[in-house]
Amino acid sequence: MSLSVEAKAKIVSDFGSDAKDSGSTEVQVALLTAQISHLQGHFAEHKKDHHSRRGLLRMVSQRRKLLDYLKGKDVARYTSLIERLGLRR
């Protein structure tokens, strides 16, 4: 199950420059992080759901690519984002 419309709107308003900024790198990474954390809870209950695990790995890979792009463009925005999201890197 994907995120609700309200949850997505809150993430966009929190991480975007305005309420309609859904395409910025920060917003995309934040949305992927929310979906990944939602799926991690799913896998705690459904350990053998390999089909969805493939989707999870795809999301993690996409988030990694976006973070690498942001790190190359603006290191300050990158460090700010990973601190706000609580990511390891």
Curated annotation (Swiss-Prot):
It holds the Pfam family Ribosomal_S15. GO terms for cellular component: cytosolic small ribosomal subunit. One of its GO terms (molecular function) is rRNA binding. CDD domains: Ribosomal_S15p_S13e (cd00353). SUPFAM superfamilies: S15/NS1 RNA-binding domain. PROSITE patterns: RIBOSOMAL_S15. Keywords: Ribonucleoprotein, Ribosomal protein, RNA-binding, rRNA-binding. InterPro entries: Ribosomal_uS15 (IPR000589), Ribosomal_uS15_bac-type (IPR005290), uS15_NS1_RNA-bd_sf (IPR009068). SMART domains: Ribosomal_S15. Gene3D superfamilies: 6.10.250.3130, S15/NS1, RNA-binding (1.10.287.10). One of its GO terms (biological process) is translation. One of the primary rRNA binding proteins, it binds directly to 16S rRNA where it helps nucleate assembly of the platform of the 30S subunit by binding and bridging several RNA helices of the 16S rRNA. Forms an intersubunit bridge (bridge B4) with the 23S rRNA of the 50S subunit in the ribosome. Belongs to the universal ribosomal protein uS15 family. HAMAP family: Ribosomal_uS15_B (MF_01343_B). Part of the 30S ribosomal subunit. Forms a bridge to the 50S subunit in the 70S ribosome, contacting the 23S rRNA. This is Small ribosomal subunit protein uS15. It comes from Sodalis glossinidius (strain morsitans). The lineage of its organism: Bacteria, Pseudomonadati, Pseudomonadota, Gammaproteobacteria, Enterobacterales.
